Amino acid sequence: VEAPEEITYSVETRSMDVSVPVDPYDAPGKREAQKWYYPHIEASTQSDAVDKINAALEESMRTDVEKTNAAPDTAKDMGGAIVFICQYRSITLTYIDNDIVCVRDQRYDTGWGPHGSTTVTGCAYSLETGDPVDPISAFGLTPEQAQSAVADAVAAYLATDPSDLLSTNAVVRDITNMCLISPATGSGIDVENPLDGCSHFYIASEGLVFATED
């Protein structure tokens, strides 16, 4: 009996065209043409799991593209309401082996105030089922171990490049507390369309990466 053929994977970068409002207040009526990129995975044999992952990534990206394309570009069209939109989004593949694939999802949302919010999350998927998996557990850690590792890494970084404003303990506390906050929340703006199973962590070739806010 021949052993089953090992599935191999490749990745293609795809894009969607987006028409992004520049600023309804300072540049009414102006829009910017952008391309938002996301990965599409190809398997050497038919894979329901890969199809499921591709559908999840494409659907999530398409939802934001459609919302941004439909977003008003003049203040009068907003009817006096605060309208939050996604001005930029990029999903990139950071890791893939025979069992797991992981992506990094970066976006910039704004309600047209003094500044918007950059949010970076990660999402890992099982290549056997296509379902999201926790990057922390996939890396063999408990949440407590991951939080401790983040604290150690931040403290080590600040030992050579300290903050001008905050103590090392304060920075470590603030960053590690992010581990307890929903990863779909960035700088006070709730992301409407996060990937299911998103995390503050993602897997990369160098190891488990913790994504801080901007």
Report each predicted region and the residues it spans.
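Compositionally biased intrinsically disordered regions enriched in Thr/Gly
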Residues: V1-D214
